[in-house]
Every structure is written in structure tokens, then in C-alpha cells.
Amino acid sequence: MAIREIKDVERGEIVNKVEDLGKPFLTHEDDEKESENNESYLMVLFSTFVAVCGSFEFGSCVGYSAPTQSSIRQDLNLSLAEFSMFGSILTIGAMLGAVMSGKISDFSGRKGAMRTSACFCITGWLAVFFTKGALLLDVGRFFTGYGIGVFSYVVPVYIAEISPKNLRGGLTTLNQLMIVIGSSVSFLIGSLISWKTLALTGLAPCIVLLFGLCFIPESPRWLAKAGHEKEFRVALQKLRGKDADITNEADGIQVSIQALEILPKARIQDLVSKKYGRSVIIGVSLMVFQQFVGINGIGFYASETFVKAGFTSGKLGTIAIACVQVPITVLGTILIDKSGRRPLIMISAGGIFLGCILTGTSFLLKGQSLLLEWVPSLAVGGVLIYVAAFSIGMGPVPWVIMSEIFPINVKGIAGSLVVLVNWSGAWAVSYTFNFLMSWSSPGTFYLYSAFAAATIIFVAKMVPETKGKTLEEIQACIRRET
């Protein structure tokens, strides 16, 4: 039996086309009031807090190697190649986790996927803590990478699926913010404690997450899709408050899921067709540029970079990075829906270009024994400008654009491709960074600056402005320019 009417889950309205499901799932319309004055969002807020413990864990894993490089290499007598493998194998695990995350969360639920992630991360941190050589160290790092690869998918999906319309936009931004906070905390406390103790602190968000999962509901949308009718309504009622009328929303979710099931399933070869080719080029290219401006190399090895620039210790620099990242990320969250995507990412790339030039010049001056008193200041200033610029645009905006340029029927497979490209680039950059620095420290940062300049040109020529447009309008714009 064909579905002729589809209820808008967020507004309780009826629409007449399956195509209306193509509208962006995450919106920022705040002008409508809730119909139920006694509606409670305490469980939504608590559930979000539990979920973003996974985001915090993500940041902790990414930020671990920067303040610990010197001490790990010294204590375990690791070569440059061995530590480079330790730093980069995180992304190999994350690639595998990201590719499998969709199937895991569809099979075991969003909560089940988060449990799986937490268990992998706990196992990984314990392996790092008990290691006495490179092998167990790499195994532990791989396990934490797999865990955060799954987290990178399931946390924002879970938050989006449990949140009411008027809170969804704000709550979903907490994912990126908590990643930054997690990495910043690793930078800060990693400068004060041993690398083994820092590994143990990585257990804390996982333990909080596992404990919290016992008290929060499963995603109502997943329960409905899995056919758990009774559990679906219980979970939705728990999220909306015991006195809230969930009839319209529950019916809308069920009808919406039925409508989605009649859409054609996407195939990998569809992504190279003319219909989707431009969107794929935009999504993949932005992820390539995001990684090849060098963020994971600079982030993973910040401490060692400052030492090479002339500091007796890299701790001051990593602390400064931590202090810059959080407020700038908050600012970027505020600006993204006001300034637009294109201006923000181009300004960000311009700042990255400047930061790379300053940092590269500091190493050039040091190598030529010129203006040595200026070298540390130039290095710190350049890296801080780089980090601030990346945090405000190049970090979050490519993910936002990726979520907007693909229609719903190919979003899953296209998103998997884009995530795989992102983690592949992260691995390549983190693995080659130390080798590039050994080859030429100035050349490394000048190379990254070239990618930043190329980003500006690419965005100006290829990327449409998506602010304030529906998904259909964005796709129409892309087709007109094809």
C-alpha cells in the first residue's frame, strides 16, 4: 500500500510528497513555541550529557600524543618511526571504526554502539598503561582509534534523534565543542602528569558513559525502525516528559520511517554519476583540504614542534593551544549561521595560511641563525594563529557542508565515503609529519600553507553558500553549476 500522506515529525503537519523528506534534518528554526507548557527536557539534557562523554573521549584520544611524545620515546626507547606509527595508528583504527559504525549502530542500537566504543577505548587505554614496548603501545592506540571512529558517527546521530526541534541545533553543537574540550584537557593535564597516568585519565569519560547509559533511553527512531513499538513509545515519553502528549510525534516518526523505506537504496556507483558527482567532489575535497593543511600533524606533535623551535620545553605551547581552542570553537559555533559557510571557511583558510607562513619562517630563521630571539615568539604566534583559524572554520564547517549537500537517499553511503577520506588523510598527515619535519621544518609548514591557499580558491570556485537554504535549493544550485 503506497504512502500518500506523511506527517512532519517536528511540526505535526501533513505533507503530500515523499520528496519532502529531503529537507535538512537539523534545523535552527526557533520561532515556534512548544505546544505543551509542562513539557520536560531534563532527560534530553541528561542523555546528551551522557552521549557527549564519547565526544570528550574522542578529544582525549586525539590530544594524547602531543604532550607525551618526548617522555614516551625516552621511557620506551622508541625510534622516530616507531612513535610516528603510534601517533598515526589511531587514525587507522578510526577508519575501520567509522566504516563499521553504521552497521554496529543499526544492529545493536545507538546505546549499544556507544557501549562498544567505550569498551574498545577502555581496552586500548589499559594496553597503553601496561605497555613495555612498541607493540602493545600500538595495539592500545589502535583500539582507542576504533572506539572513537564509532563515536564520531553514533554520538551526533543519537543526539539528533532524541532532541526536540527547539533544542536540536544547540545540543548538536556540543559534540564538536566536547571534542575540543577533551583534547584541550589532554594538553593541559598531560603537561603536568606522566604519560601512563594520562592514559588512565582516558578511562574516566568511558566509565561515566557506561554508567550513564544505564539510565538513559534508546533512540526512539531506532526503536521504531527496529519494530520495537512498545519500547519506542516508552522511550519517547521518557524524553518528552511524563505529562507530554507524544501522539502526533510518535505517529509522525512511524509514518516517516515507512516512507524512508520506499526510497531507492543507494549504490556506491551512484556517487560518480552526474547527479551526485559535484556534491561528492565538494564533500571529499573539503575533507582532503581539512586534513592536508596539517592539523593532525601539528596537533599530535605540538610539544615536539615547540622544542624544535627553540623552547626548552613544549609544555607552555601545548597549554596555550588548549586555552585558544575552546573559546574560538564556541565563537565559530555562533558565527556559522550568521556569516555563512563560504566566508567562514575562506577566512579560516587565510588564517591557517598566515599561521603556517609565520611558523615556517621561524624555523627558517633558526636554521640560518638569524634573529634567534624572535624564533620562539614567531613559532608560538604562528601555531596559535593556525589553531585559532582552524577551530573557527576549517574544523567544523566541512562537516556541516557535507551534511547539507547530499540528499537523504545517498547520505549514508556518501557520508561513509567522506568519513573514510577524512580519516585516511588524518593518518597520512600524522604519519608523515615527523619525517617532513626531519626533511625540512620550514618546507613542512610552507607545504601546508599551499594547501590552505588552494582551499580558498576551491571554495570560491566550487562550494555554494548553503546558509538559509533547503536541501532542494542547495541541490538545485549545485545542478545549475554542473
Curated annotation (Swiss-Prot):
GO terms for molecular function: sugar transmembrane transporter activity. Pfam families: Sugar_tr. It is found in: Membrane. Keywords: Membrane, Sugar transport, Transmembrane, Transmembrane helix, Transport. It is a multi-pass membrane protein. The keyword Transmembrane helix applies. SUPFAM superfamilies: MFS general substrate transporter. GO terms for cellular component: membrane. It comes from the Eukaryota. The keyword Magnesium does not apply. The chain crosses the membrane at residues 42-62, 80-100, 117-137, 142-162, 173-193, 197-217, 280-300, 316-336, 344-364, 382-402, 413-433, 443-463. Sugar transporter. Belongs to the major facilitator superfamily. Sugar transporter (TC 2.A.1.1) family. PANTHER family: PTHR48021, SUGAR TRANSPORTER ERD6-LIKE 16. This is Sugar transporter ERD6-like 16. The lineage of its organism: Eukaryota, Viridiplantae, Streptophyta, Embryophyta, Tracheophyta.
